[in-house]
UniProtKB/Swiss-Prot annotation:
<keyword id="KW-0150">Chloroplast</keyword>
<feature type="transmembrane region" description="Helical">
    <location>
        <begin position="140"/>
        <end position="156"/>
    </location>
</feature>
<feature type="transmembrane region" description="Helical">
    <location>
        <begin position="203"/>
        <end position="218"/>
    </location>
</feature>
<feature type="transmembrane region" description="Helical">
    <location>
        <begin position="457"/>
        <end position="472"/>
    </location>
</feature>
<protein>
    <recommendedName>
        <fullName>Photosystem II CP47 reaction center protein</fullName>
    </recommendedName>
</protein>
<comment type="function">
    <text>One of the components of the core complex of photosystem II (PSII). It binds chlorophyll and helps catalyze the primary light-induced photochemical processes of PSII. PSII is a light-driven water:plastoquinone oxidoreductase, using light energy to abstract electrons from H(2)O, generating O(2) and a proton gradient subsequently used for ATP formation.</text>
</comment>
<feature type="transmembrane region" description="Helical">
    <location>
        <begin position="21"/>
        <end position="36"/>
    </location>
</feature>
<keyword id="KW-0793">Thylakoid</keyword>
<feature type="transmembrane region" description="Helical">
    <location>
        <begin position="101"/>
        <end position="115"/>
    </location>
</feature>
<keyword id="KW-0472">Membrane</keyword>
<keyword id="KW-0157">Chromophore</keyword>
<dbReference type="InterPro" id="IPR000932">
    <property type="entry name" value="PS_antenna-like"/>
</dbReference>
<dbReference type="GO" id="GO:0009523">
    <property type="term" value="C:photosystem II"/>
</dbReference>
<keyword id="KW-0604">Photosystem II</keyword>
<feature type="transmembrane region" description="Helical">
    <location>
        <begin position="237"/>
        <end position="252"/>
    </location>
</feature>
<dbReference type="GO" id="GO:0016168">
    <property type="term" value="F:chlorophyll binding"/>
</dbReference>
<dbReference type="GO" id="GO:0009772">
    <property type="term" value="P:photosynthetic electron transport in photosystem II"/>
</dbReference>
Length: 508
């Protein structure tokens, strides 16, 4: 059978046993990849600094997903939140990876068994003796089972009733930990940033799935609906399954890119909108303002800013700064963050505090402009010295650091002031180690960016797949050239004009 590559799946079209076999093999591949990828990531992951070198800076992709479901400890004796553990238990990172690999092996064997023993009695219609599947019944079974799993996840795993809970954090990603979550049954449950909505929605959706599954098991579809939606055709199953998958992919691409309770910034990195809106900058200034109101000095107020919060307020952690095809982790780009140098405060010779305009997300270069509290430009680094009026030298700008490693250090020589003004464009200033990984200094995206790009791309592809297979199953008779009027159209002498039903001859 000389099939072209895009038609090879027709070999399982009317073969339920081997259709099942290839799906089990696919599950084996997916599970095997997940387990192997987890082991690879654990081999290269450095857990020593959860603040300045978290999993998302290191380009971890599957570790964040395990962590958000409640896995925090490793058989290597470390915890994702820092510190050591003595008894991580079976459900550690390695335990989950191993379970996936064992499951993959079992699926592999099951796939081979079903490929060899494809002609089972269960796949044959007892009335006709031909291979056939009761698709509406199978739909009911799957809906019931997935509803049961969905309900169980929401009612037991997330709530901590029988399970660890999920990763929950504060709005600024500072205090995250795995904890049990109570379902949010009020209107707050519809807020995508409220973790309680995850529990309540899984319980509600699971209940609906169980009831819908029982309905489809006990009620047969009407004949007209069965025929109209081609419920006896396996390609209908393919089309509607693709629809479910692409819809889910679009949804998770959105929750990942825009942020939600399911995609904590401690695990996947901040979103681009948090940089665009100055989200962390506002919180830092609020905390400093609160400290000053309590009669703390500027240095004391800035010293109390958590390094973790300052690190979020750095453009290198913005997932939209990495080029789409720049491979590698964020650490391979601007380097491994070593420490916060402190917050630079610039002043002109008249004592006015100046603020460096920050680089917008989609700029690679941006002019260095310093404005006062009213937004009036007071200093810059000019492109042409001959025409400059606001140069650092002319205005006499100085810089002093508060908090961090350079706390209390000030500079007045123009070259150093300009250096730190350029770096202040990129948010808070950090010392970055580019030697260890031979980092090239070009920003990379975080797993948040990769996940979004991948899922949005595949969702679009699967959308077209749904249209394609839906059209094929709905119009199969047309595409195959099978038409109820076909006999009459080609019968010699049926029409005065060949194939024209308006000129049908009268039977004498």
């Amino acid at each position: 059978m000389g099939l072209p590559w895009y038609r090879v799946h027709t070999v399982v079209l009317n073969d339920p046993g081997r259709l099942l076999a290839v799906h089990i093999m696919h599950t084996a591949l997916v599970s095997g990849w997940a387990g192997s990828m987890a082991l690879y990531e654990l081999a290269v992951f450095d857990p020593s600094d959860p603040v300045l070198d978290p999993m998302w800076r290191q380009g971890m992709f599957v570790i964040p997903f395990m962590t958000r479901l409640g896995i925090t400890n490793s058989w290597g004796g470390w915890s994702i939140t820092g510190g050591t553990v003595t008894n991580p238990g079976i459900w550690s990172y390695e335990g989950v990876a191993g379970a996936h690999i064992v499951f993959s092996g079992l699926c592999f064997l099951a796939a081979i068994w079903h490929w060899v023993y494809w002609d089972l009695e269960i796949f044959r219609d007892e009335r006709t003796g031909k291979p056939s599947l009761d698709l509406p019944k199978i739909f009911g079974i799957h809906l019931f089972l997935s509803g049961l799993a969905c309900f169980g996840f929401g009612a037991f795993h997330v709530t901590g009733l029988y399970g660890p809970g999920i990763w929950v954090s504060d709005p600024y990603g500072l205090t995250g930990k795995v904890q049990s979550v109570s379902p949010a049954w009020g209107v707050e449950g519809f807020d995508p940033f409220v973790p309680g909505g995850i529990a309540s929605h899984h319980i509600a959706a699971g209940t609906l799935g169980i009831l819908a599954g029982l309905f489809h098991l006990s009620v047969r579809p009407p004949q007209r609906l069965y025929k109209g939606l081609r419920m006896g055709n396996i390609e209908t199953v393919l089309s509607s399954s693709i629809a479910a998958v692409f819809f889910a992919a679009f949804v998770v691409a959105g929750t990942m890119w825009y942020g939600s309770a399911t995609t904590p910034i401690e695990l996947f990195g901040p979103t681009r909108y948090q940089w665009d809106q100055g989200y962390f900058q506002q919180e830092i200034y609020r905390r400093v303002g609160a400290g000053l109101a309590e009669n703390q000095s500027l240095a004391e107020a800035w010293s109390k800013i958590p390094e973790k919060l300052a690190f979020y307020d750095y453009i290198g952690n913005n997932p939209a700064k990495g080029g789409l095809f720049r491979a590698g982790s964020m650490d391979n780009g601007d380097g491994i963050a070593v420490g916060w140098l402190g917050h630079p405060i610039f002043r002109d010779k008249e004592g006015r505090e100046l603020f460096v305009r920050r680089m917008p997300t989609f700029f690679e270069t941006f002019p260095v402009v310093l404005v006062d509290g009213d937004g009036i430009v007071r200093a810059d680094v000019p492109f042409r010295r001959a025409e400059s009026k606001y140069s650092v030298e002319q205005v006499g700008v100085t810089v002093e650091f508060y908090g961090g490693e350079l706390n209390g250090v000030s500079y007045s020589d123009p070259a150093t002031v300009k250096k730190y003004a350029r770096r202040a464009q990129l948010g808070e200033i950090f010392e970055l180690d580019r030697a260890t990984l031979k980092s090239d200094g070009v920003f990379r995206s975080s797993p948040r960016g990769w996940f979004t790009f991948g899922h949005a791309s595949f969702a679009l592809l699967f959308f077209f797949g749904h249209i394609w297979h839906g059209a094929r199953t709905l119009f199969r008779d047309v595409f195959a050239g099978i038409d109820p009027d076909l006999d009459a159209q080609v019968e010699f002498g049926a029409f005065q004009k060949l194939g024209d039903p308006t000129t049908k001859r009268q039977v004498v």
